[in-house]
Regions:
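NUDIX/MutT-family hydrolases
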Residues: 99-102, 110-146, 155-163, 168, ...
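Active-site segment of metal-dependent pyrophosphate-handling enzymes
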Residues: 13-20, 30, 59-63, 67-111, ...
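Long, intrinsically disordered, low-complexity Ser/Thr/Pro-rich regulatory/activation regions
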Residues: 194-242
Length: 242
């Protein structure tokens, strides 16, 4: 039996590298998309990406594709997300795509090309191919990792108050978390540390809030069995009698 590499039936499908780049902007989680000028899906919004070149690794390819849209150094984290191989995902012919998840911290405001913009993940425009579904997969990955890993470092500025960090987690998770519980959990896991400094006082005055930072900007699993869950809301009328 001949080798698959010498077989005339050896597949020769184009392989693409795509990137889902997320950032919390104005208290909402956004995805970076670009508007396609040509068919298929002219006028629809797509993820940054393109074909894998000969001799190029997937990691090198996604970095090259991203460089056309955003300064790669702005990313706080980049990891491989998933591979899509549905035969019908591209009307021009079969393609395989490997998607990456990238995160940009809030203190960075990258300059984007004219065809590229940030869109709230909970209100995406019409997307090309299966890119809307890939964004949803990236969102699920991020929410899962916020529960068991320290990936919040890639969304946060170098220093922050607990209230500011809570806003980032609420935007990314899609539901409310209390600042007190978030602080308690992350300190217990050894993820946060106080800087010893305080934030400038607000307009209302009061005691200045303490500043914190993530202990490391390297991804690590801090609690493999942990899961953040949305608060349980009791149905109306389900309470103790007065």
């Amino acid at each position: 039996m001949g080798s698959v590499w010498s077989s005339p039936e050896r597949p020769a499908y184009p392989h693409q590298a795509l990137a889902v780049v997320l950032q919390v902007r104005a208290r909402r989680l956004h995805a970076m998309l670009w508007e396609r000028p040509n068919e298929p899906f002219a006028g629809a919004w797509a993820l940054p990406g393109g074909p894998l070149l000969p001799g190029e690794t997937l990691g090198a390819s996604v970095a090259r594709q991203l460089a056309a849209k955003v300064e790669v150094g702005h990313l706080g984290h980049l990891e491989q997300l998933e591979t899509r191989s549905d035969p019908g995902r591209d009307p021009r012919g079969r393609t395989v795509a490997t998607a990456y998840l990238g995160l940009v911290p809030t203190h960075v405001d990258p300059a984007l090309p004219d065809d590229t913009a940030w869109h709230p993940v909970d209100a995406l425009p019409t997307t090309a191919f299966d890119h809307g579904s890939i964004v949803r997969s990236a969102l699920a990955r991020l929410r899962s990792k916020l529960s068991y890993a320290n990936v919040g470092f890639a969304l946060a500025p170098p220093e922050f108050t607990v209230a500011e960090l809570r806003e980032l987690y609420v935007a990314a998770l899609g539901y409310d978390v209390t600042a007190t519980n978030l602080q308690r959990v992350l300190l217990r896991r050894g993820v946060l540390e106080p800087t010893g400094e305080q934030a400038p006082p607000g307009r209302a005055g009061g005691r200045p809030a303490a500043l914190y930072r993530f202990v490391t900007a390297q991804l690590s699993v801090t609690d493999p069995f942990a899961v953040f869950r949305p608060p349980v809301r009791k149905p109306p009328g389900d309470g103790a009698d007065a």
